[in-house]
């Protein structure tokens, strides 16, 4: 392949600083020949920490995928550990769409027999277990632990987030007797190397894993199957505030890319 791979990393929340952080993390591992476009929805929650916010964020993910399809994007990463809107995005996209939770679980089992997950808030633990079951990794995961740090506090130096997440990872490794840690929030992406050095086991960041896998799938000529469940949605009227999402309608041009 001679042309650059165009990879769109979608931060499902609307906080620009987190979009920038996610974009930097993706670019570190993307390598030559991959153009990373980190974007966020034009509307939606400032962070995703509940089922309600995840449902709202999914609409923003689909907005950015539709815009990406009109712009010739080759692959997508949904950069929130709940993988919001992942199945729906796969119905819309020509190329592969990866969620960071699914990618992180795969990566962890490639470097360790069993792993543990350290996430942000206790209320998100159930969603992590749900995804482990769905993706087939429940037996490989020894536990899911919350460090009780709100998502937006992860980038606040005054919160002591790095130290608190590191302590939670160390405690989880010892309690679960595992050989790897999966970080359960895209906002933790910048901590990976420091935590791994401190704890002494591989620490998997889903943004890095999904970025690497998405580019590899494009290079291998693999894309989401258009047969069966991931076939394009049928065209039908969509009314009200979501009318612009009707299949066949022109997507809004108001993408919000980072610099």
Predicted regions and their residues:
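Glycine/small-residue-rich loop that forms an oxyanion/phosphate-binding "nest" at active or ligand-binding sites
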Residues: 58-113, 117
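Periplasmic-binding protein-like
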Residues: 9, 70-80, 177-185
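N-terminal beta-loop-helix "entrance" segment that forms/cooperates
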Residues: 38-63, 152-157
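Short hydrophobic/aromatic-enriched beta-strand-loop microsegments
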Residues: 95-102, 137-144, 201-208
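N-terminal beta1-alpha1 ligand-phosphate binding loop
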Residues: 5-29
């Amino acid at each position: 392949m001679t042309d650059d791979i165009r990879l769109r990393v979608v931060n499902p929340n609307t906080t620009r600083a987190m979009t920038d952080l996610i974009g930097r993390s993706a670019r570190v591992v993307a390598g030559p020949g991959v153009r990373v476009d980190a974007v966020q929805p034009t509307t939606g929650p400032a962070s995703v920490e509940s089922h309600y916010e995840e449902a709202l964020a999914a609409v923003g993910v689909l907005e950015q995928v539709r815009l990406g399809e009109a712009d010739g994007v080759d692959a997508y990463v949904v950069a929130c550990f709940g993988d919001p809107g992942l199945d729906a995005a796969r119905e819309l996209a020509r190329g592969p769409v990866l969620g960071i939770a699914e990618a992180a679980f795969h990566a962890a089992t490639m470097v360790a027999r069993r792993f543990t997950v350290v996430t942000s808030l206790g209320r998100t633990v159930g969603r992590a277990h749900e995804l482990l079951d769905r993706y087939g990794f429940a037996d490989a995961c020894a536990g899911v632990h919350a460090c009780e740090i709100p998502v937006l506090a992860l980038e606040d130096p005054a919160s002591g987030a790095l130290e608190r997440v590191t302590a939670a990872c160390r405690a989880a490794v010892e309690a679960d007797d595992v050989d790897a840690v999966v970080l359960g929030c895209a906002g933790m992406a910048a901590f990976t190397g420091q935590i791994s050095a401190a704890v002494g086991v591989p620490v998997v960041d889903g943004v890095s894993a999904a970025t690497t896998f998405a580019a590899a799938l494009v290079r291998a000529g693999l894309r989401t199957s258009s047969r069966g469940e991931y076939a394009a949605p049928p065209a039908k009227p969509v009314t009200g505030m979501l009318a612009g999402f009707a299949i066949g309608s022109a997507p809004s041009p108001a993408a919000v890319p980072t610099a």
